[in-house]
Amino acid sequence: VEKAVKKTDKITYQAMEAFIHNLNTMHSRAGAQVPFSSVNFGTDTSPEGRMIVKNYLLAVDAGLGHSETPIFPISIFKVKEGVNYNPEDPNYDLFKLSCQVSAKRLFPNFEFLDAPYNLQYYVPGRPETEVATMGCRTRVMGNVVDPEKAVSPGRGNLSFTTINLPRLGIKHGIVGARANKKADMEGFYAELDSLLELCRDQLLERFEIQCKK
């Protein structure tokens, strides 16, 4: 049994290496970008889950071919008291390992499940109620229509739009080639309101198209 576990552990590490390498070399998105991917982990206390998390962290720590830091997948370690936060917790060793890896590679990021805005959704024994994030920004959890569906799986961004606020600031501000003698705050907010309405209409139109797919 010990020999089998050791062999499985080695194979798992190689699988994690391949997983990370693939997600940093598959230029399959628009513009030949690699997939924007995220992995949330840290609360699985099963032997299999612990083995995967340990080897994933070790693979991140080792880096890519020339020891470069792998950017993808974005790694998020979920911290939970009673699971991995305290020395007596079953996954505390993985929490310590994640801190060591983060000190070197800047990943993983950390998601604190005991934070009040996350803990309100947490139900012991239901992993789907553990808040998960997409990369370093998107957190979709609450459901005002059906609180029973306030879960992580199947959630995310349908679409997104960016507003260039610095450009608006320069356009209506007192710096740059088109500098004004005085900041035009009314003009800034008027154009911002117009852009917000445009983004709203654009997102609703995309939503209607996506609903028909």
Segment roles from a protein language model:
Residues 1-213:
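Conserved catalytic cores of very large enzyme subunits
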